[in-house]
Amino acid sequence: MKQVLLACFGIWFLSTGAARALAQPSAQQKVIIDTDIGDDIDDAFAVGLALSSPELKILGITSAWGDTELRSRMVDRLLCETGRSDIPVKTGIKTASKATFSQEAWARAGKLRSHGDAVEFMLEQIRKNPGEITLIAIAPLTNIGAAIDRDPGTLKKLKRVVLMGGSVRRGYDEFGLAVARPPEAEYNMAMDPAAAQKLFGFGVPVYMMPLDSTQLKLDEVRRAMLSTVSTPLTDSLQVLTAEWQRMTHQTTPTMFDVVAVAYAVNPELCPATPLHIEVDDAGNTRERPGDANVHVCLNSDSDRFFQFLMPRLLEQKLHGDSVCVAP
């Protein structure tokens, strides 16, 4: 079975032109990733894609929402496993969270380290690199809202924010339903609508990947591809997926946050339309008349997305040389 999957992947990889794209990265862009890794599984895949993308120079990864210290510990372990402990990890504002930390066991097995303040780290990096940093926000926007409050002049010097969040013309998909649900309050927006309101009215360029374009399913065939290779990243993603499945009783991961990272690397994967979006107090993101304040990707091509994602995860050579678990 493994040989069949490898052969199928090789034919698909070469025929799609993905190999050529992977071999010819564009100039690096500086990014900071703000993530609530550990609840849903898509954050781990999003960080994995970022680590596998030579187009990105990751200045740091910041944890957001809920138990942010444990999230930082999880990021530490993932970076250690993949040989990227050179990337700074900072801890964001801790909040109450009702979401299940589905990958807690894997996170707690990592080494305990100290971390600095995520908000101050963001601001320091922007001061050092004005107009150059893309902030990839794949979590509730609490850290960004705090940065606006703390030093709005500095945050104005972001190049752009690429975020996963919102629901403009369709809501969450449900298996078995022929028609998508109507727009609704998406999780990242609903958890901290005040922070989202601050960002959407702030004036920095915002590129939004809502539910409309991010509900792409990592089906069983593609999940099986991860078992055709054995690298620290693919092994970690398989273990984390199994933990997520066990804790949530779900089977098929949805790549919500991965779309935001993919867009940062290649905007052609999710063409964005300028719209005027208002965030209400419940976190609904309403399309309204008026001057555009956000660029929104309303549709994505699932096949094209996975033709981009899977080769990067399967062909990366990331490898750590340290013991990454606590004794």
Where are these regions (language model features)?
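Sec-dependent N-terminal signal peptides
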Residues: 4-12
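C-terminal segment of classical bacterial N-terminal signal peptides
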Residues: 12-20
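Conformational coupling and interaction surfaces
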Residues: 25-28, 45-52, 187-190, 194-327
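Active-site histidine-anchored catalytic micro-motif
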Residues: 25-35, 41-73, 110-208, 212-214
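Metal-dependent C-N hydrolase catalytic cores
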Residues: 27-28, 33, 69-128, 133-134, ...
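Short glycine/threonine-rich catalytic loop with a Thr-x-Gly-x-Asp
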Residues: 38-39, 254
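Short, well-ordered secondary-structure micro-motifs
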Residues: 100-102, 172-175, 219-221
